[in-house]
């Protein structure tokens, strides 16, 4: 067996409509399908679906840093720091606090969705990882 690629990610949310508004309305992910039981929305970036949200109800606990499970979902938004600046401005205008991070091979913004799930928007910044794979583990502050 050989895994060929990552197919999609599904995250659990409290309210499907709030999540659709966030991922489609704010971030611009195109909705391609819905499911009623369990309530789900599927988003596509060119495949049948790349990302989905599944409603688990208002009583669900928020994710925490010390909890086993998904740490964050990352979406590439371009190859230029100006793309990241535009994204930061967009998030700032929507009153979504974000943390800029320099990973050397990428420049990133980290923030939370309405349920506390962590999201990363990033731009590629360097191909250094091709020669030195360990470079993907770099992390520091980013001033943008």
What are the roles of these predicted feature ranges?
Residues 58-64:
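Short beta-strand/turn micro-motifs at beta-sheet edges
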Residues 12-56:
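Core segments of cupin and vicinal oxygen chelate
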Residues 6-8, 68-72:
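Short, solvent-exposed beta-strand edge segments and adjacent coil->beta transition regions
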Residues 39-41, 48, 122-144:
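Amphipathic alpha-helical "stalk" segments
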Residues 1-3, 65-68:
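Short, flexible turn/loop "capping" segments at secondary-structure junctions
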Residues 13-17, 73-118, 123-129, 142-144:
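Vicinal oxygen chelate
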């Amino acid at each position: 067996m050989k895994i060929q690629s990552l197919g999609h990610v599904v995250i659990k949310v409290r309210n499907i409509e709030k999540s659709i508004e966030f991922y489609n309305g704010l971030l611009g992910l195109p909705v391609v399908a819905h499911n009623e039981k369990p309530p789900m929305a599927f988003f596509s970036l060119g495949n049948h679906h790349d990302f989905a949200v599944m409603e688990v109800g208002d009583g669900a606990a928020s994710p925490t840093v010390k909890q086993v499970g998904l740490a964050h979902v990352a979406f590439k938004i371009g190859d230029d720091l100006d793309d990241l600046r535009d994204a930061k401005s967009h998030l700032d205008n929507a009153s979504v606090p974000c943390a800029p991070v320099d990973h050397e091979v990428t420049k990133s913004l980290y923030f939370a969705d309405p349920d506390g799930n962590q999201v990363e928007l990033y731009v590629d910044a360097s191909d250094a990882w091709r020669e030195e794979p360990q470079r993907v583990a770099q992390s520091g502050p980013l001033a943008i």
